[in-house]
């Protein structure tokens, strides 16, 4: 195990906090965004689907990127990309769409590689650190959903996006000291391991369960607020 920064655990916690909040609050304030931009709410509905599309696309080659760039370096670039994507959503409607795509792509890469990052840095604390970031993600998502409307009413939808961008920026800055402690993923054996996984019933059970869990979560986040 290589040396690691003292900011690794705080970085993991803040990554958990930033892993859902930049886009899960959007359905709650779609009405305010439509009024602010002078467009129909229906034209903004795709904002809730764009991150999920990015999840699908960028999950496919996140591992290859980590093998070439390294985990810590890739997380640094992804968090920077996440912050910029969140920021440009404030400018106009086209950049709102582009920024949402950037947010989704960044989170997709982080989401896929976070377990590998923990394993590379703290192989003896995988369970603890996984619980830590999942818990921080759940609490942050709940708080963001609860506070989104009061914050928007007290300022505007842009005020809420600014706060979320500052959260992303704080995560990036706290993570930055970890950039120098870079781990590269080892190349995986292709054909045999893939065949075994695809014929494993337990793997398919987990895939189906996770798929339905995500379906219920994102459906609720999209439709219940409105």
Predicted regions located by residue number:
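Extracytoplasmic
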Residues: 7-41, 59-62, 220-225
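Cytoplasmic helix-loop-helix junction between adjacent transmembrane helices
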Residues: 101-135
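Conserved MFS/SLC helix-loop-helix module at the cytosolic interface between two early adjacent transmembrane helices
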Residues: 57-93
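Short hydrophobic/alpha-helical segments at membrane-entry points of transmembrane helices
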Residues: 94-100, 206
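Residue-level signature of mid-helix packing/kink "hotspots" within the transmembrane helices
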Residues: 24, 51-60, 141-142
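Extracytoplasmic gate region of multi-pass secondary transporters
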Residues: 26-27, 202-226
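Helix-loop-helix hairpin linking two adjacent transmembrane segments in secondary transporters
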Residues: 124-125, 131-180
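Juxtamembrane intracellular "pre-TM" segments in multi-pass secondary transporters
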Residues: 1-2, 180-207
């Amino acid at each position: 195990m290589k040396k690691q920064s003292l900011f690794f655990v705080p970085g993991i916690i803040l990554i958990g906090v930033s892993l859902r909040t930049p886009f899960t609050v959007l359905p709650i304030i779609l009405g305010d965004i439509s009024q602010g931009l002078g467009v129909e709410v229906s034209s903004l509905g795709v904002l809730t689907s764009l991150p999920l599309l990015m999840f699908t696309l960028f999950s496919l080659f996140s591992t290859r990127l980590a093998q070439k760039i390294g985990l810590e370096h890739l997380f640094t670039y992804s968090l920077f990309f996440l912050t910029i994507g969140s920021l440009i959503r404030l400018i106009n409607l086209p950049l709102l769409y582009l920024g949402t795509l950037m947010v989704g792509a960044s989170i997709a890469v982080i989401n896929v590689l976070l377990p590998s990052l923990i394993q590379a840095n703290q192989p003896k604390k995988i369970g603890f650190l996984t619980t830590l970031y999942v818990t921080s993600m759940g609490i942050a998502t709940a708080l963001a959903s609860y506070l989104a409307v009061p914050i928007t009413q007290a300022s505007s939808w842009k005020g809420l996006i600014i706060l979320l961008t500052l959260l992303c920026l704080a995560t990036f800055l706290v993570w930055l000291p970890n950039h120098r402690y870079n781990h590269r993923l080892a190349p995986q054996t292709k054909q045999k391991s893939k065949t075994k996984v695809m014929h494993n019933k337990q793997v398919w059970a987990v895939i189906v369960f996770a798929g339905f869990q995500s379906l219920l979560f994102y459906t609720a986040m999209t439709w219940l607020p409105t």
